[in-house]
Amino acid sequence: MENIIEINYNQTGKSKKTNEYGMREMQARAFEKRNSQYLLVKAPPASGKSRALMFIGLDKLINQGLRKVIVAVPERSIGSSFKNTDLKSYGFFENWKVDPRNNLTVGGDNSKVKSFVRFMESDDQVLICTHSTLRFAFEKIDDKAFDNCLLAIDEFHHVSADVNSRLGELLRSIIHNSSAHIVAMTGSYFRGDSVPILLPEDEELFDKVTYSYYEQLDGYEYLKGFGIGYHFYQGQYTSAINEVLDTNKKTIVHIPNVNSGESTKDKYDEVGKILDMIGEVEYQDDDTGIIYVKRHSDGKTLKIADLVDDQVGRENVVAYLRNIEALDDLDIIIALGMAKEGFDWPFCEHTLTVGYRGSLTEIVQIIGRCTRDSYNKTYAQFTNLIAMPDAKDEVVTYTVNTMLKAISASLLMEQVLTPDFKFKRRRNESEKSSTTGELFVKGLKEPSTENVKKIIENDINDLKAKIMQDSQVQKTFSGEVDPKVLNKVLIPKVIQKVYPNLSDEEIEEVRQHVVLDTVMKGAKSEVVGSKEFIRMADKFINIEDLDINLIDSINPFQKAFEVLSKELNSPVLKLIQETIDAKRINFDEDELVFIWPKV
């Protein structure tokens, strides 16, 4: 299997080093904005968001005069990230302390809401609870009770601007009816796959701190590289998984949801078949729930955690996973809905996911499981096992669409896993470009309004997500559509849909930056003599000759076509093309006028 994406990192150690206050690079960046009333922190898994919140929360209590800090997490297990922490020994002015009575993520569900209400009426300062407890407690207390308090929402992508989202409604109510401060934290670079997290007018209130995935991984000590690959199968995935499951690597296997097309509809049988493929089950430990399997190839005993079986013993398995310390404590995890968000197994080298995942946030979370820095690995891998279209298959259109969506998701991941560029319009020949600094581009329109500037600086990845998930755009992955039609017709259409208030001039400015950024992040840099060249699609270009017209002649999704061509045989490619052709791209009259000279 050849990877569609390969990224190398420089092991600078920067993201792990701490300053005189004991803060890592991301935490120090967030702490600089500690006085903001509303703060949105976007940073990848394992970058230290929990501790960043501790620093900010303590400053708000001690130096800014706030009364309380309330931390809401999506599930109980994540509450342990906010346990008592010694910060003073590393240079900070106070330790993070939580009274056991106020950690509502421990134990059963009895009287959690009562405990929350008691906390709000007491002089206690710090409380940890789940999103669910926060929602139910909110119904019992007035918005004004949150005056002069900090409400921190971890895994903020769970919030939604949808009118039916109770967490979203709660947040809007607190913003508009109290003097509360809010810190929102997320490891996802995409607001949501259809509904935004916040209404635009609410989002404008937030100061933003972004720490990129590239900064995080490039600043690691051990990790040198990361790859994203696809493997296509026909029939049932359980008969093909052995082709991509390397049992020498510490691996998390995510099997498909029982409602998905890839599922056999019997999740327990699927786990059984995977175990049989690996080896012979020797026994299951009564205390821990861990399954001991004697590997077929060499007789080595592997320790495997089954998180799919949701019977009584799963709590024991979860408890075992929480206390893993040694490399040999575990070899493989098989999971369905678990081992994603907030789950920590630094030794994991490979995440193998069966079937397409509709949520980009979920893909970010899954990838985050294998990209932790650890002494046992220099390379991490995400593999997606996807059904190959079959002409005899009744759901061939569904399979083709699923494949295109999966490939678009990995192209999006490449956009956040590679370094960011700074683009400027080339005004004279003496300006020198560099892929590690500024890139000068002939004919590039620079932002003419504050609105465009904000979109380019803060929302470009969200916009790319909308573009790549657009069904019309995905039809261009087969390589049959002229790049200029994609870049100058289809992409502006999506921009206009997402930002209906932009003028034509503003749309063009945003379009140029989106296309340019997408093309450059998929390009490879090569130095020949004293000159730097960029290889993009089938072109090899001197970095000083970058021109917006040249960029517009390149399909930014060329890689999608390349992966399809390499991994699939001719009959399957023909089938994909025919399926796409059956659903032609629709153009209005103005668009046809633009396209006509090319036909």
Swiss-Prot record:
Ranges of residues in domain Helicase C-terminal: 236-408
Q: Which domain of life is it from?
A: Bacteria
Binding site residues for ATP: 43-50
Its EC top class is hydrolase
Record-linked InterPro entries: DEAD/DEAH_box_helicase_dom (IPR011545), Helicase_ATP-bd (IPR014001), P-loop_NTPase (IPR027417)
Q: The motif DEAH box: which residues?
A: 154-157
Q: Domain named Helicase ATP-binding: which ranges?
A: 30-207
ATP-binding in keyword set: yes
- UniProt entry keywords in alphabetical sequence: ATP-binding, Helicase, Hydrolase, Nucleotide-binding
Protein name listed in UniProt: Putative ATP-dependent helicase YeeB
Organism listed in the record = Bacillus subtilis (strain 168)
